[in-house]
């Protein structure tokens, strides 16, 4: 199974937020953002920070394919 973050990108569009703004709000590194873009594993702490910034649940930003 592979992790997909396509729901994260849809949510960013819905909230009219770009990746740079998300990085600023969550202190995510460029390397971690690249991992998200490639659908690679990232630290759970990063996912929690994203959810806190976007006021959503983990299931709102990721899924297993």
What are the roles of these predicted feature ranges?
Residues 1-20:
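A short, Lys/Arg-rich alpha-helix, primarily the initiator
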Residues 55-65:
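Short C-terminal boundary/hinge segments that cap the last helix of small helical domains
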Residues 16-34:
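Short alpha-helical DNA-recognition segment
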Residues 9, 20, 34, 48, ...:
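Residues within the helices of the helix-turn-helix
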Residues 39-52:
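Short, basic-rich loop-to-helix N-cap that marks the start of a DNA-contacting helix
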Residues 26, 37, 65:
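DNA major-groove recognition helix of helix-turn-helix
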Residues 12, 23, 51:
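The alpha-helix within a helix-turn-helix
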